[in-house]
């Protein structure tokens, strides 16, 4: 697995997980102790051989004594070489711990990476009109910087660790200085696998290649109490887990159960976040599959507190709802806020296929309608289009106002003109000619 293509969530979590440099420093102390013991044994053995063979009055005389001294010389050389190897292993462990501490200090903290991702999620969920696009771009740029920072730290860590490893000499080469009678395996050791020659730097480990830990069962584990292969951390059960207390395979974080989970306390497969149960959830506290957000229960929900399938928004109960729903009732295909029923758009509607505000029937549009297919305001019947049919449909309910003086004057003038026209018409009918217009002054 190439760490250069891994996101900062993986690299940061890996470098910060586990027991840290403490086990490596403890191994360095142990190697120092072993080197001291081997050095004391070599000095004591050399002094003893010298006392037996040196001078004419020594205890060992003759050809047999010379042969014994020659046979003891390789063991003295082996003790001196083993002392040097143990001192080198102690120095290598200290150098490895220093390289790790430098890499950890140069790596972005997992909390900083998680804060960046949470900020991006918040900006995306609230980006209804595109107002958060500059902030989203800035957050992504910061994420790229975190990625580059982690890659640079891991490159330095890889180079330092490789240098330390190249300076170590395999212990198998040291056995070549011993006589054949010692290097030959006893009869009871026939069939022992050669892989057991791989050193395991730890205590009470069972397996091959377990480093820097205690009580690992399996192969190539780093940490303590791991069961399986290639685990890094403490108390993992499975394979390729990075963190603490994971059960399954390839989990990154702590307390995960399943496969390919990233975060903490996830139960299932391929969850990103914390406390998710199911598959392909992103966020926290989701239960189901394909949820994006917080506290969703169901499948393919986006938002928070949704219960059902394919809801977008918050507190929707049912399926295919968009907006903010009622947390205590169930609806289907609603858009808006607080709707209960099916196919509503608007606010606080109950029934089916309504649009507007606080309609109680089916197919109503407007405000406060309590019947079906009504449009307007506060209708109580069916298929009404006026406002407030409870009083507007009754003629007796309309208010009666007294006529004004202008209305009275207009009425009287109209009546006078009508009377004059009637007199003229009656005269024409009786004489056959219109009345003559008088000329001159009228008295």
UniProtKB/Swiss-Prot annotation:
**One annotated Gene Ontology cellular component of this protein:** plasma membrane
Q: Which UniProt keywords apply?
A: Cell membrane, Membrane, Repeat, Transmembrane, Transmembrane helix
Q: Where is this region: 4 X 10 AA approximate repeats?
A: 231-270
What parts of the sequence cross the membrane? 15-35, 38-58, 59-79, 181-201
Record keyword Transmembrane helix present: yes
Q: Where in the cell is it found?
A: Cell membrane
GO BP: biological process involved in interaction with host; response to host immune response
| Pfam families found in the cross-reference section | Pentapeptide_2, PPE
| Homology family | Belongs to the mycobacterial PPE family.
**Protein name, as recorded:** Uncharacterized PPE family protein PPE13
Q: Which organism is it from?
A: Mycobacterium tuberculosis (strain ATCC 25618 / H37Rv)
Q: Which gene encodes it?
A: PPE13
């Amino acid at each position: 697995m190439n760490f250069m293509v891994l996101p900062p969530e993986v690299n940061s979590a890996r470098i910060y997980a586990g027991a840290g440099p403490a086990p490596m420093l403890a191994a360095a102390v142990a190697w120092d102790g072993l080197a001291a013991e081997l050095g004391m044994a070599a000095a004591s053995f050399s002094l003893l051989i010298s006392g037996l063979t040196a001078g004419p009055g020594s205890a060992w005389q003759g050809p047999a004594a010379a042969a014994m001294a020659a046979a003891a010389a390789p063991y003295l050389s082996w003790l001196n070489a083993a002392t040097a190897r143990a001192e080198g292993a102690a120095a290598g462990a200290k150098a490895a711990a220093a390289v790790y501490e430098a890499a950890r200090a140069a790596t972005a903290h997992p909390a900083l990476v998680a804060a960046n991702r949470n900020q991006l999620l918040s900006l995306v969920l609230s980006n209804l009109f595109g107002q958060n696009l500059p902030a989203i771009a800035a957050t992504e740029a910061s994420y790229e910087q975190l990625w580059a920072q982690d890659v640079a730290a891991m490159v330095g860590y890889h180079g330092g660790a490789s240098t330390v490893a190249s300076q170590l000499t395999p212990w198998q080469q040291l056995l070549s200085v011993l006589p054949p009678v010692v290097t030959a395996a006893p009869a009871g050791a026939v069939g022992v696998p050669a892989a057991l020659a791989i050193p395991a730097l730890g205590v009470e480990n069972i397996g091959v290649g377990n480093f820097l830990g205690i009580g690992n069962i399996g192969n190539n584990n780093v940490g303590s109490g791991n069961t399986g292969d290639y685990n890094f951390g403490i108390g993992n059960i499975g394979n390729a887990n990075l963190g603490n207390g994971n059960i399954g395979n390839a989990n990154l974080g702590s307390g995960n159960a399943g496969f390919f989970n990233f975060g903490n306390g996830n139960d299932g497969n391929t969850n990103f976040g914390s406390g998710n149960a199911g598959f392909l959830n992103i966020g926290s506290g989701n239960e189901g599959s394909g949820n994006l957000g917080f506290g969703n229960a169901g499948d393919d929900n986006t938002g928070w507190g949704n219960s059902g399938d394919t809801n977008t928004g918050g507190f929707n109960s049912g399926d295919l709802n968009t907006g903010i729903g009622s947390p205590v009732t169930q609806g289907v295909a609603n858009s808006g806020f607080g709707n209960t029923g099916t196919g509503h758009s608007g606010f606080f509607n109950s029934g089916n296929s309504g649009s507007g505000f606080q309609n109680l029937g089916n197919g109503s549009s407007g405000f406060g309608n309590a019947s079906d297919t009504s449009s307007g305001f506060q209708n109580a019947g069916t298929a009404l289009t006026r406002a407030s049919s409870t009083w507007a449909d009754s003629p007796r309910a309309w208010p009666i106002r007294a006529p004004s003086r202008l209305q009275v004057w207009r009425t009287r003038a109209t009546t006078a003109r009508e009377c004059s026209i009637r007199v003229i018409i009656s005269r024409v009918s009786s004489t056959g000619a219109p009345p003559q217009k008088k000329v001159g002054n009228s008295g």
